Amino acid sequence: MVSIKPFRAVRPNSYDVDQIASLPYDVVSKSEVLKLVEDNPKSFLNIDRTDVRFETEDADEVYELAKDKLADFMDKGWLIKEEEPALYIYRLLQGDRLQYGLVTTIAVADYADGHIKRHEFTRPDKEKDRIRHNDCSDANTSPIFLTMRKNSKLKFLLKKERDARLPLYSFDSFNDTNHCIWRITDPATIENIQS
């Protein structure tokens, strides 16, 4: 089984979450990003796609600006750092399509040891870009998505957590998608989910 751990997230405050939410960095063109960040200074693309402001996409300045933009968002209170480690339940609702996920950290060793199967082949230049971006900003700004086999126990635990509290966020964003997120901080519950 893959090891998962809670983490201290840097996340949007509740008031700005719908403005900060953005499309994944790799599904929008340079011209689309420029328009989106011009129209919305709170868009997370201001951090995730700083390359659009430079002639050379992999210049050191690209990654330094990402680090500076992340600090600026935090200084302005648009992004806040969690006090304690947490797991997050993430629900996406688009039309009649409903998906649930668990936001967590995983061990790279689980991938190296074959416990996580590769589902796509990524371009080495894009991998290098994201590694530099994460290293320089000291943040994972582009999480990866994993899928897993059906797990009735986990499904039950996550439903119980959703039913026990109001979500941290519930907002509509791009593509008519509703995003709903619950935070789990109770150590016993986290341990139960990890098992």
Please name every model-derived segment.
Residues 1-194:
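A cross-family signal for N-terminal binding/gating loops and helix N-caps
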